[in-house]
């Protein structure tokens, strides 16, 4: 019985010592400067985003098609938070991440959203940023772009109580309803959206 206990103790100790090697990363990252990441796209484009209204979430994939794990030294938005883009990398939100491990022949999602600040103009404005990746001192990037458009916003059941014109200078976004009071006229210019 004593011999069985000692044998089980030795086996348990050996198994526990082997567990850290099972995560596949354990600081054995390749430092090969020829290894690169691959991406599912080189440009992540958003359709026109109305100012102050957030976008839908878009995504792209990071691939490590190499035969060894890599440590991504940094993943960051080139402009920080200045352009309104936000990202989630490997389940973490932020504009900058350091030392993100990726196994050999594995992949990882990057989720991106954008909210465009009003610019006071009537025409769509191109907003660009990049997600920058550094691996073994080599920088790679994925371009982010969206068109921001200021809108005339009517929110929460607005009632028009005097004669009005909806102009064609910028789009209208109506949440809930837009009611025209009795006896009031509403003219809509040609081309108004």
Predicted regions and their residues:
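Surface-exposed binding patches on compact interaction domains or structured appendages
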Residues: 23-45, 65-113, 118
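Low-complexity, Pro/Ser/Thr- and charge-rich linker/hinge segments at domain boundaries
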Residues: 29, 142-165, 169-170
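Terminal connector regions
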Residues: 23-27, 116-150
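C-terminal motif of bacterial Sec signal peptides marking the signal peptidase cleavage site
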Residues: 18-21
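Coil residues (strongly favoring Ser/Thr
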Residues: 43, 48, 74, 107, ...
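Extracellular beta-helix/beta-solenoid repeat scaffolds
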Residues: 167-193
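Buried hydrophobic-core signal for structured, non-transmembrane domains
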Residues: 57-64, 112, 127-134
């Amino acid at each position: 019985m004593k011999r069985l206990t000692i044998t089980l103790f030795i086996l348990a100790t050996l198994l526990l010592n082997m567990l850290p090697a099972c995560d596949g990363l354990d600081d054995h990252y390749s430092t090969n400067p020829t290894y690169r990441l691959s991406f599912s796209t080189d440009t992540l484009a958003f359709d026109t985003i109305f100012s102050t209204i957030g976008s839908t979430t878009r995504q792209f994939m990071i691939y490590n098609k190499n035969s060894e794990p890599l440590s991504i030294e940094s993943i960051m938005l080139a402009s920080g938070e200045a352009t309104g883009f936000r990202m989630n990398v490997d389940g973490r939100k932020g504009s900058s991440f350091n030392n993100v491990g990726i196994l050999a022949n594995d992949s990882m999602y990057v989720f991106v959203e954008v909210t465009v600040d009003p610019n006071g103009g009537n025409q769509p404005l191109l907003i660009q940023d990049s997600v920058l990746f550094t691996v073994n001192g080599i920088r790679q990037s994925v371009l982010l772009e969206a068109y921001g458009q200021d809108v005339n916003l009517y929110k929460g059941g607005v009632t028009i109580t005097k004669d009005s014109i909806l102009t064609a200078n910028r789009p209208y976004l109506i949440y809930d309803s837009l009611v025209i009071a009795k006896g009031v006229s509403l003219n809509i210019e040609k081309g108004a959206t």
